Amino acid sequence: MSTILKSLPKGENVGIAFSGGLDTSAALLWMKQKGARVFAYTANLGQPDEADYDEIPRKALEFGAEKARLVDCRTQLVHEGIAAIQSGAFHVSTGGIAYFNTTPLGRAVTGTMLVSAMKEDGVNIWGDGSTYKGNDIERFYRYGLLTNPELRIYKPWLDQQFIDELGGRAEMSAFMTAHGFAYKMSAEKAYSTDSNILGATHEAKDLEHLDSGIKIVNPIMGVPFWRDDCAVKAEKVSVRFEEGQPVALNGQTFTDPVALFLEANTIGGRHGLGMSDQIENRIIEAKSRGIYEAPAMALLHIAYERLVTGIHNEDTIEQYRISGMRLGRLLYQGRWFDSQALMLRETAQRWVARAITGEVTLELRRGNDYSILNTESPNLTYAPERLSMEKVEDAAFTPGDRIGQLTMRNLDISDTRRKLNLYTQTGLLSAEQGSHIPRLDNDKS
């Protein structure tokens, strides 16, 4: 049996993820008038651009909802954000600057917590505003059915009758006004924005064109650090972790992780830390472009990785990075709670994060420009005396030890020389005239 409904199920309970914006307001009123019993659910994700969360359910009731609930998702979202930092679950980056998967993390929490609330109310049909070209339609589909296997999906934006009657924002605004709800369309921005406490995503419209850059974006979590008239002063910041958990900023201890994230957002946001411009592959393999903000995630990630490199050995760090790339893709695809993701995540949290105790001090400047000033941890395996260029007592190894180690390298050096000679004989390599360095025959550089 198909779980996707192509037309409105009249007379049935239908839940809608309600944002209070024009689209979901018009959809709620339209579904009510067409005979559905509409239940509205709003996720409080700590969106930085939302002024009054309590007003949103009240609006839903005015528009005809049978019931309207505000579901506080902030603690769970911050918990998942910290888990992503602990496991390095970030696979998209440009020039070493990462996208922190803040929207995929938000969808994982929204999709599970709202559907759980619907299930409590006897609502087994869910609608949201995701379009068929994006990632969210699949993320919400997966998380919804994981939470409630009896769930069916109804999306007004996939219903041809809804599209014919209310196909655009102008039609929606006129529809609301005609039914006694004065609803002015907000000024049209050059891009769309989606946000939560972990970060903000700016995409679509003008940002679909690669010759429109970050300068057209008005940050909602930071400052336009690229502007000459934007004053940004250098700031010294300390971040402390205990067994992988961020616990203190600038010496202030936080027992509430949400409060810590809000403060980290404020600190990082003063500098525009964590803003990035990324080209990525959507789930359906088409490329899209987004400009992202994530000041707290960036600040915590920098400090966490500094401790990782000072505490763990090379092979552990390699596995952490490789597994993190894979886990980041799974998160992006809406598979954050799949078994293969849980396996990678739990491994990093247990064997990497548990050792991460210490404090990192940074100097933040403009954007992603920063310096690390100090790194302290009782678990550091960094020991400068081991490699000191000065004469030290009780050295970890002697010149004679190194001679023996280098002599052992003769084995693999000899093997490598034989392979290079073999490749030259078969024509795979050729010696550059006047040089003893072999080159690939097809290397025209």
From Swiss-Prot:
Annotated binding of ATP, by residue: A17, F18, S19, G20, G21, L22, D23, T24, S25, A43, G129, T131, D136, D194
Protein family (similarity comment): Belongs to the argininosuccinate synthase family. Type 2 subfamily.
Binding site for L-citrulline: Y99, N135, R139, S192, T201, E203, E280
EC number: 6.3.4.5
Protein known as: Argininosuccinate synthase
InterPro entries, A to Z: Arg_succ_synth_type2_subfam (IPR023437), Arginosuc_syn_C (IPR048268), Arginosuc_syn_N (IPR048267), Arginosuc_synth (IPR001518), Arginosuc_synth_CS (IPR018223), Arginosuc_synth_type_1_subfam (IPR023434), AS_cat/multimer_dom_body (IPR024074), AS_multimer_C_tail (IPR024073)
GO CC entries: cytoplasm
Gene3D superfamilies linked to this entry: 1.10.287.400, Argininosuccinate synthetase, chain A, domain 2, HUPs
GO BP terms, alphabetized: argininosuccinate metabolic process; L-arginine biosynthetic process; urea cycle
Pathway: Amino-acid biosynthesis; L-arginine biosynthesis; L-arginine from L-ornithine and carbamoyl phosphate: step 2/3
Assembly notes: Homotetramer.
Gene: argG
A single GO molecular function term of this UniProt record: argininosuccinate synthase activity
